[in-house]
Amino acid sequence: MNTLGRFLRLTTFGESHGDVIGGVLDGMPSGIKIDYALLENEMKRRQGGRNVFTTPRKEDDKVEITSGVFEDFSTGTPIGFLIHNQRARSKDYDNIKNLFRPSHADFTYFHKYGIRDFRGGGRSSARESAIRVAAGAFAKMLLKEIGIVCESGIIKIGGIEAKNYDFNHALKSEIFALDEEQEEAQKTAIQNAIKNHDSIGGVALIRARSIKTNQKLPIGLGQGLYAKLDAKIAEAMMGLNGVKAVEIGKGVESSLLKGSEYNDLMNQKGFLSNHSGGVLGGMSNGEEIIVKAHFKPTPSIFQPQQTIDINNNECECLLKGRHDPCIAIRGSVVCESLLSLVLADMVLLNLTSKIEYLKTIYNEN
């Protein structure tokens, strides 16, 4: 499937080296002021070619809105948008057109469909994630109207982990590092991987919070069984290229703790800790929503690797092209967009949870 969401639905299309990639965002309420500066800034954050720590492929990533916006406001109809591919170099992939690149989707796409677009991975390329960032910008505009903001940064590159989380610093950092003190060591780890024609994995931290410091997030976003907020977050992020694990709150560490250590105690002012990551019973509890997305090392490395071709013959694969040495860096921005899309979808879903909400809408007329 190529669609994410239920009430706010994003459908994407296009391939890495096709003429365009694009999306249709259906379910966006009317009357939302389109923040073009926000849209442009989000695309630039994800953009490659800005420094040595990301892919040299630098696309313009100008978002062409084709429908759903009139006089700078959303109309309530589907928002269609296109992003042109202008910097593709398909010749870089001629030598692997009949080979399966190790740990890429080539093998599975070929066996599932019997045909594959070998140019940059086609539909399986992370180039598609630019669409999710554009759609996430629209979702952010919706969330801003009700006082919710999402932000992200890098907490780990290889084994080098942040000890302090500063989201303001992440916005200024070349690698979106959350910890200024650990940033140089993390950069060195990436540079060493590049020097050795290798790549490295990383972990992104994404959070949602109230825009106002003295307010909480809405309680009750998500549903208790088949639309759990944490499940939908994990589903969205696991659908992103290279993500191999997603944690909410304490995540994996929870399995090492006792109940007396893990439980979030409460008083009249609220929760005394946030080990649950802002989600209880599949619904938001008002605290910050805390998510970690674990990215594998970029599978495109410039070392000879053993593989097979489409005829099952063993051979050697030596890649060319332009690739991210650490996909977690730009991936953190995409995860932030995905969290925004999921929360916007859940906000719209929540309108159906109480008859009072519907009465408020329809009794106004």
From Swiss-Prot:
Its cofactor is FMNH2. GO terms for biological process: amino acid biosynthetic process; aromatic amino acid family biosynthetic process; chorismate biosynthetic process. Reduced FMN (FMNH(2)). FMN binds at R123, S124, S125, N241, G242, G281, K296, P297, T298, P299, S300, R322. PROSITE patterns: CHORISMATE_SYNTHASE_1, CHORISMATE_SYNTHASE_2, CHORISMATE_SYNTHASE_3. It is an enzyme of class 4 (lyase). NADP(+) binds at R46. Its EC number is 4.2.3.5. Keywords: Amino-acid biosynthesis, Aromatic amino acid biosynthesis, FAD, Flavoprotein, FMN, Lyase, NADP. CDD domains: Chorismate_synthase. Disulfide bonds: none annotated. GO terms for cellular component: cytosol. InterPro entries: Chorismate_synth, Chorismate_synth_AroC_sf, Chorismate_synthase_CS. It catalyses: 5-O-(1-carboxyvinyl)-3-phosphoshikimate = chorismate + phosphate. SUPFAM superfamilies: Chorismate synthase, AroC (SSF103263). Pathway: Metabolic intermediate biosynthesis; chorismate biosynthesis; chorismate from D-erythrose 4-phosphate and phosphoenolpyruvate: step 7/7. HAMAP family: Chorismate_synth (MF_00300). This reaction introduces a second double bond into the aromatic ring system. Belongs to the chorismate synthase family. This is Chorismate synthase. It comes from Helicobacter pylori (strain G27).
